[in-house]
Amino acid sequence: MNILKAIKKLFKTKDGVKRKMTYPSVEALRILHQMEAVEKQAVILKERHGADFNSFFYRHMTFNIIKSEVMSVLYPKHRSEIYTDIHWDSHWHEKHVLNFPGPIYTGVTDNGGAGECAPENVMVDQEGCEYIYHQPRNYTQLIEVSLAAELDPFNAYSCDGNKHWNYELVKNWWHNRSEWISQLMDPLLIKHNGADIVQLYIDYLNSDTAELDLRRYCFFLLNNYYPAEDNMDLPIIS
């Protein structure tokens, strides 16, 4: 909640005394309200489905989970029929190469900045098109990515990655990570995202953590369930 703390500081001076006649901007208030709403929605999902997010998220039909569970939390006052109108169509044939393998990915998105709703999961390329650099790790991030998907006018977010990724494809993607890192070093891409964010993805791709995440994902693809944290009997990808 670093952003939330930063916004709240707008109300105070360094000594903790509230400023007189000083208010955060409309944009800051919008972000604050959105973050508070997302946190409340994440709590609802956790109460309904338990603390084990990976068991909830990594299922064969992630598409159905998002439509039936996540969207019902985002739109609790709407009839269930509305969820069929929310687009998470398949865009595998135009999947962005910088998408980190997993259930959610993007095709050719708009460049209007919808990904700003999910800063811990979404980046943009040289043209401002969005891609997933981190699969959601908790209910909060899943809701934020879902919000970004809704805001994309091209409806280019997809959640049928489990139908298309397989062990060999994940291995090949990981084998080519030096190419993905090279693309991330493009000056225009860095300008769009900020050097710190780009470095986060580069460091992730160079880490044992990313490899372990993909090995666990391959285990899921091969066995149709996500492995326990202490399960190290995982497929080799390098």
Task: Label every model-predicted segment.
Residues 2-238:
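Non-ligating segments of multi-cofactor redox enzymes
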